[in-house]
């Protein structure tokens, strides 16, 4: 079964940005404690951009699935009745139980995947204030999936060396997180 992109063809091709939660927290601490950031509003994103058309095949490979095509769907609606299916996956693979509703915000996922315009957020003001950290989004996604797998929230891959039967990653990610340190 292919891993289809749950947005439109336009959404698959436009420039997008994401924000790593740890990076966002670091930025908030910086903004709230540095005089150079006083009384100003800031955009906080990872500092890079990507196209889902380039990232989605990597995600499909991580899950050991063929990469599908854009297939518009409302995940919030589609996932409404999938709790029992998720519970069976959790039981079959011995995962830590979390309700499907707490694993992801499907409404937010719809917002992210439905966007049909380029999004390039100006983080220049934040840089000029002295916060120069950044996160490589592709490496961030890989790291988050690995963290979910290590926490037993996602199954291991069939090919994963620690399990002959579960879901993980044989994918060799070429990009490392390019996080520079900030003085927070």
Spans of features found by a protein language model:
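Acidic, Ala/Val/Gly-enriched low-complexity intrinsically disordered segments
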Residues: 175-177
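A conserved pocket-lining segment of Rossmann-fold NAD(P)-dependent short-chain dehydrogenase/reductase
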Residues: 1-19, 43
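Short, well-structured beta-strand/strand-turn elements
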Residues: 131-140
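Aromatic-acidic/polar surface patches that form glycan- and anion
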Residues: 13-21, 48, 115, 119, ...
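Aromatic-glycine-rich donor-binding/catalytic loop that engages nucleotide-sugar donors
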Residues: 9, 128-132
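Mid/C-terminal beta-alpha module of Rossmann-like enzyme folds, strongest
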Residues: 24-109, 114, 122-124, 128, ...
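Short, intrinsically disordered C-terminal tails of secreted or membrane-associated proteins
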Residues: 180-183
């Amino acid at each position: 079964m292919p891993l289809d992109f749950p947005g439109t063809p336009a959404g698959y091709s436009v420039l997008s940005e994401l924000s790593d939660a740890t990076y966002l927290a670091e930025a908030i601490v910086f903004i709230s404690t540095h005089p150079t950031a006083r009384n100003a509003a800031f955009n906080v994103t990872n500092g890079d951009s990507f196209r889902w058309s380039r990232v989605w095949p990597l995600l499909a490979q991580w899950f050991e699935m063929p990469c599908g095509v854009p297939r518009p769907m409302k995940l919030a609606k589609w996932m409404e009745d999938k709790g029992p299916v998720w519970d069976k996956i959790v039981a079959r693979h011995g995962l830590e139980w979390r309700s499907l509703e707490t694993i992801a915000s499907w409404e937010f996922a719809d917002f992210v995947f439905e966007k049909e315009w380029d999004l390039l957020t100006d983080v220049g003001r934040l840089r000029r204030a002295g916060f120069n950290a950044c996160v490589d989004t592709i490496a961030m996604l890989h790291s988050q999936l690995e963290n979910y797998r290590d926490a037993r929230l996602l199954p291991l891959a069939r090919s994963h060396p620690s399990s002959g039967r579960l879901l993980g990653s044989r994918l060799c990610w070429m990009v490392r997180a390019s996080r520079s340190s900030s003085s927070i």
